[in-house]
Amino acid sequence: MSWFESLILGLVQGLTEFLPISSSAHLRLTAAFAGWHDPGAAFTAITQIGTEAAVLIYFRKDIARIVSTWFRSLFNKGLRSEQDAKMGWLVIVGSIPIGVLGLVFKDAIVGPARDLRLTATTLILMGIVLGVADRLAARDEEGGRHRAIRERKTLQQLGVKDGLIFGVCQAMALIPGVSRSGATISGGLLLGFTREAAARYSFLLAIPAVLASGAFEIKDVVENPGHISWGPTIFATVIAFFVGYAVIAWFMKFISTKSFMPFVIYRILLGILLFVLIGTDVLSPHAGESGS
């Protein structure tokens, strides 16, 4: 991987990680359109550490409070009813599905799941799901003829069942094109949570999963150092951190007043375009993969 490639891929990772459009799909597509090799699951997992570091800093006060209260609640029963202590457990519970499924389907994730036809399919299908979830949320918030405004749930009303459902949605993002934030936010909206609550829990839930995935890939790369270019990968990770932080700040303001429909339309059009390019042999479904 060249330094120019790492710059572009770092920008793409930072720009797309927190938007409901799938960073893994965009990394894969960028490489395919540019005629580069697929950066691979290891590159994606490691650069995601950069964007996750942006989450740690942006939500540092919330995270510090949650971790502190959760840890102290292990020794102080009086703190176990505190919302922050509960949130600590809910993040752990919500992380179980992706941990289990990630290990079980690791070979498929780094192989067949990176087929661009599957990516196009998931871009469209999850775009439709996000659109439906967004529309339901808008109806609750706006009300309408013969329909009263409905109060949506906040994080204070998040339960273990909700956490597990969020977790299953997050696990779906193991497939390129699904989008971690898109799947979890859609799940949250369908469960009746506010946009901000769904997005905030989505970002918190991603922390252990992304850091664990990155650490796992780093261990694998250290044992097989020929699989990745360390210098460009670290450079891309740093770029992803700075760009990702700016995107989080913008996105959290955006969701408080705006609809997700621009992302829905973008996902569907991109998926259709991808099918057209593959169907007309302009692009191979395996474009960018090693040996293609």
Task: Pin down the residues of each PLM region.
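Multi-pass membrane proteins that catalyze or facilitate reactions on polyprenyl-/lipid-phosphate substrates
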Residues: 1-292
